[in-house]
């Protein structure tokens, strides 16, 4: 039964990536300045990209939805990696789903043990990048430039930590 469930999850992941990734173009953002934005988080606070970049070397912007299987599989790995790098890396996960209300998102965060910032993509930032695949993850450096774009889920903590290590390698630690 466990093997069948694993096979089913892999097939759902492959199908989702194949179908949703076909029209996505957020990769065009690589190397460009990401527009500043403010989003209300489920904790009631405002998350502003430019403010976060004043205290972090990198900001991870993750577009997702509660119904997205690959998104759900990726989150525990992102959470664990973020906990390790929280002093230098910030995370904002923005749901693109209109029905993902604050109550739904709070429940989801509790269920998955997520403690990084979570909000809704009410400004349709993913749409403005002509993206329609989730999860889509962009990483912005301290200058506001997009230094990484990934369409699809990361399936291990190591994928995140290796990426963070490579991006942080050339950034001096400010004490």
Predicted regions and their residues:
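Thiol/disulfide oxidoreductase modules built on the thioredoxin-like
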Residues: 107-115, 120-168
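Structural microenvironment flanking redox-active thiols in thiol-disulfide oxidoreductases
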Residues: 72-112, 123-128
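Hydrophobic beta-strand anchors of alpha/beta hydrolase catalytic cores
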Residues: 60-61, 91, 137
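Short pre-active-site segment immediately N-terminal to redox-active cysteine/selenocysteine motifs
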Residues: 56-59, 63-67, 133
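N-proximal helix/coil linker or "cap" segments that precede and/or mark the start of modular domains
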Residues: 15-36, 53-55
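A short beta-strand-turn-helix
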Residues: 38-59
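Bacterial N-terminal signal peptides that target proteins for export
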Residues: 1-8
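Bacterial N-terminal signal peptides
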Residues: 8-16
